[in-house]
């Protein structure tokens, strides 16, 4: 088997990321350097300007929030930057560091280089967000041969073991995004009927709202907490939220005082009601677009870590009147599905034939002038149209002596183009005829997100423009410069990561503690630093073990 035949799938998540491979007739998760499947999507820079990715960076959100970045997937497609130490990074660059770490883990596990991968993205990601995802892959030295929608990837993993004709709804609530997809299984075909979503609704929003309520109950203004204190509070609230206990008990520190509060289920439901109601909107839209009622859904598939929150599950059960399908881990199924799609793409001999039909999750069209009103959006391909697809609409020039037209291509669902996303703009020259001219504009869209626009004029000439999701927003030189800069960054040595992660955990505990407890942890840190400086690994292991027992810390 040569390198090109490796079927690799990646779930590049807001909170955690995973990588999987199709191997020995099944999709398998690849462990990271800590033997874990979930790699936190967090980047930090230490005092020696080493980049820390994943678990070693988690604790530094509390101890060094000014040098740590998280939730950057939410900024894909924007101009947001993060400053870590003396360096500045954008969302694709930070994402590329996560992808690079996953790539190294896979190459270590498989003992072979990898290049071509299938990467999952939220179904409702815009064209620009998809471009940034491809750019992140390129900066990491990977080739994203396919971007697969996250609910569709989950359906691939679920559908591979579903030998029956069923209609399913995939409810995908991750750390930062929410997607709903309605599918139908008719072996061996998986047909996507409709998708809807909210790119700014996820588990982090529930955490943020809970933090605000904790501060309100304590009569503490958010502005009185420094970055480290606020990060420590977020960590406490997130841990309590993920415990799914009832009542939810939160214990945190403020100005050398321990604060505690409890939230009962009815209180959480009242608090989170605005977010829970937002979950209904994409569900109702997807069902409406698929022309189905909740009672016509045969199975409910929950995906994403936040979908495991009891109140979220209760909302889903109320809407559909049935319990969710539970025979998989919702945090890992997307990566497995991406690997299955990669295997299907390579036509691996040891995989059953699976035919996937997907949809365009958003409407694509052009800007027109109607009755003297400019800036009107005219859809050519409506949202949730099965792809590949080709559609044509006929338009007319605005003036008899018009010598050119500007084709502004937009995506979105708003009547006004100013509220949609501009995808591309180009001019088409016309021959003056002294009369109004009829113009046909054809959109052809394929499963890889490639859009071809054909403008057919009255004289029979055609002007074509191909719009794809390659990172065209940067020049080849700019991409190469960014790749070179990222490659020059010093990634913390793999063989020392366990000790670095343990040190970060000690620093996090010190940042949270107060008084005598803080002093004791400080002494432990001093002992551990001295052991590290001695380069005596036996001594390092012994100090780490004693510190772990004394402070009840899990050794990574």
Swiss-Prot record:
It comes from the Bacteria. Pfam families: HSP70. Gene3D superfamilies: 3.30.420.40, Actin, Chain A, domain 4 (3.90.640.10), Substrate Binding Domain Of DNAk, Chain A, domain 1 (2.60.34.10). Disulfide bonds: none annotated. Coiled coil: none annotated. PROSITE patterns: HSP70_1, HSP70_2, HSP70_3. GO terms for biological process: chaperone cofactor-dependent protein refolding; protein refolding; response to stress. Keywords: ATP-binding, Chaperone, Nucleotide-binding, Stress response. One of its GO terms (molecular function) is ATP-dependent protein folding chaperone. This is Chaperone protein HscC. It comes from Escherichia coli (strain K12).
């Amino acid at each position: 088997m040569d390198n090109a035949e490796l079927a690799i799938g990646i779930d590049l998540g807001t909170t955690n990321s995973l990588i999987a491979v199709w191997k020995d007739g099944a999709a398998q998760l690849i462990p990271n350097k800590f033997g874990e499947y979930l790699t936190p999507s967090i980047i930090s820079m230490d005092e020696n300007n080493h980049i820390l990715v994943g678990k070693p960076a988690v604790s530094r959100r509390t101890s060094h929030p000014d040098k740590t970045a998280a939730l950057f997937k939410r900024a894909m497609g924007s101009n947001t930057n993060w400053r870590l130490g003396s360096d500045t990074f954008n969302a694709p660059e930070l994402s590329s560091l996560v992808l690079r770490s996953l790539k190294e883990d896979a190459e270590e596990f498989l003992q072979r280089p990898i290049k071509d991968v299938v990467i999952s993205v939220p179904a409702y990601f815009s064209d620009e967000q998809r471009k940034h995802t491809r750019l992140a892959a390129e900066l990491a030295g990977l080739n994203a041969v396919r971007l697969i929608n996250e609910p569709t990837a989950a359906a691939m993993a679920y559908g591979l073991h579903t030998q029956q004709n069923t209609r399913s709804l995939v409810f995908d609530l991750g750390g930062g995004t929410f997607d709903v997809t309605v599918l139908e299984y008719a072996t061996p075909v998986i047909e996507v009927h409709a998708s809807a979503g909210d790119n700014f609704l996820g588990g982090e929003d529930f955490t943020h709202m809970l933090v605000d309520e904790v501060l309100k109950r304590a009569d503490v203004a958010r502005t009185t907490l420094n970055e480290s204190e606020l990060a420590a509070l977020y960590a406490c609230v997130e841990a309590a939220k993920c415990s799914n206990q009832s009542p939810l008990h939160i214990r945190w520190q403020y100005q050398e005082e321990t604060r505690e509060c409890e939230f009962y289920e009815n209180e959480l439901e009242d608090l989170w009601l605005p977010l829970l109601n937002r979950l209904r909107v994409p569900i109702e839209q997807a069902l409406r677009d698929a022309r189905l009622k909740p009672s016509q859904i045969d199975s409910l598939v929950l995906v994403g870590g936040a979908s495991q929150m009891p109140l979220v599950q209760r909302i889903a059960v109320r809407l559909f009147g049935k319990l969710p399908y539970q025979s998989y881990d919702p945090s890992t199924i997307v990566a497995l599905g991406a690997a299955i799609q990669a295997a299907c793409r390579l036509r691996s001999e040891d995989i059953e034939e699976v035919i996937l039909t997907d949809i365009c999750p958003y409407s694509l069209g052009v800007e027109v002038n109607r009755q003297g009103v400019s800036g009107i959006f005219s859809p050519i391909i409506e949202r949730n149209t099965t792809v590949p697809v080709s559609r044509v609409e006929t338009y007319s020039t605005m003036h008899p002596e018009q010598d050119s037209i500007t084709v502004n291509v937009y995506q979105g669902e708003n009547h006004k183009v100013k509220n949609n996303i501009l995808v591309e703009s180009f001019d088409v020259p016309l021959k003056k005829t002294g009369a109004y001219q009829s113009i046909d504009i054809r959109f052809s869209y394929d499963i890889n997100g490639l859009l071809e626009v054909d403008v057919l004029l009255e004289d029979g000439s055609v002007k074509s423009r191909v719009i794809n999701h390659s990172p065209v927003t940067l020049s080849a030189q700019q991409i190469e410069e960014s790749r070179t800069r990222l490659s020059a960054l010093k990634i913390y040595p793999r063989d020392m990561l366990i000790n670095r992660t343990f040190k970060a955990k000690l620093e996090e505990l010190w940042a949270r503690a107060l008084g005598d407890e803080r002093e004791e942890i400080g002494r432990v840190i001093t002992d551990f630093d001295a052991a590290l400086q001695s380069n005596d690994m036996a001594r390092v292991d012994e100090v780490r073990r004693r510190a772990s027992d004394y402070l009840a810390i899990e050794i990574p």
